[in-house]
Amino acid sequence: MEQESLNQERLVEEIAKRVKEILQLIGEDTEREGLKETPERVAKALLEMTSALRSPQPYIKVFSLAENENSSVEDQIVLVKDISFSSLCEHHLLPIIGKVHVAYVVGKSGKVAGLSKIIRLVNYYASRPQIQERLVEQIAEAIMKSDIQPKGVMVIGDALHMCTYVRGVKDREASLISLSTRGIFSTKPSLKSQVFRLINTSKKSSTFL
C-alpha cells in the first residue's frame, strides 16, 4: 500500500510538470493565483479518469436465482438501465458523458450478477481513453465471458461527446448511440425489441436514451 502511494505521488508530480509546460506553451502565466495548483489538480483528475489502465478488471460475482432444482429462471431478461458514465475521448482527451443500458438473457445455470457488479464493470471500461463503440463492445464481451454464462448480451450506449460540443462543429444537440450484441440477441431481433420496450418503460426525464 505504501509503495502504491509513493508511485501515485510520483505520477502526480511527473504529470503536473508536463501540464505546467503545456499551460506555459499556450501563453499562460502559471505563477498567477488561479493557476498555481492547476497542474497538480489536472494530474490527479487525469489519473482518476484513467484508473482502469492501472487496475485489474473487477470480478463479476454471481448468484443463482433458482430457489430449487425444479424452479427455473432460464431465458429471463435482466436489464440494468440508465447506468451513468463518463470517459475520455481518446482523440482529444475531452469528456464523454452519457448512459449505458446492459441486458442479458439468463442461461441454463440460472446465474445472475449483482447490480453493483454490472455498474462497476461499466465504470471500469469507461475509466480510460476510449471511444464509445469500443466501450459497448468491451462491456458486452466481458459479460458474455463471465460466470453469468448468459445466452446473450446487449449493451446500448448513448452519450454526448465534448469533442464535438466545445470544439470543431460545436454541435450542442448531437449524441452518439452505439449498440453491441452477443449470443441470442444477435440472432433474435424480437429480443432486442423487448429490451428497447423495457428501457422506455417508466423512462426517466433525461437528455439521454
Swiss-Prot record:
GO cellular component: cytoplasm
Organism domain of life: Archaea
Binding site for Zn(2+): C89, H92, C163
SUPFAM superfamilies according to UniProt: Tetrahydrobiopterin biosynthesis enzymes-like
Pathway where it operates: Cofactor biosynthesis; 7,8-dihydroneopterin triphosphate biosynthesis; 7,8-dihydroneopterin triphosphate from GTP: step 1/1
Record-linked PROSITE patterns: GTP_CYCLOHYDROL_1_1, GTP_CYCLOHYDROL_1_2
GO BP, one annotated term: one-carbon metabolic process
Catalytic activity: GTP + H2O = 7,8-dihydroneopterin 3'-triphosphate + formate + H(+)
Keywords for this protein: GTP-binding, Hydrolase, Metal-binding, Nucleotide-binding, One-carbon metabolism, Zinc
Entry keyword annotation includes Metal-binding: yes
Subunit structure: Toroid-shaped homodecamer, composed of two pentamers of five dimers.
Protein name: GTP cyclohydrolase 1
Gene expressing this chain: folE
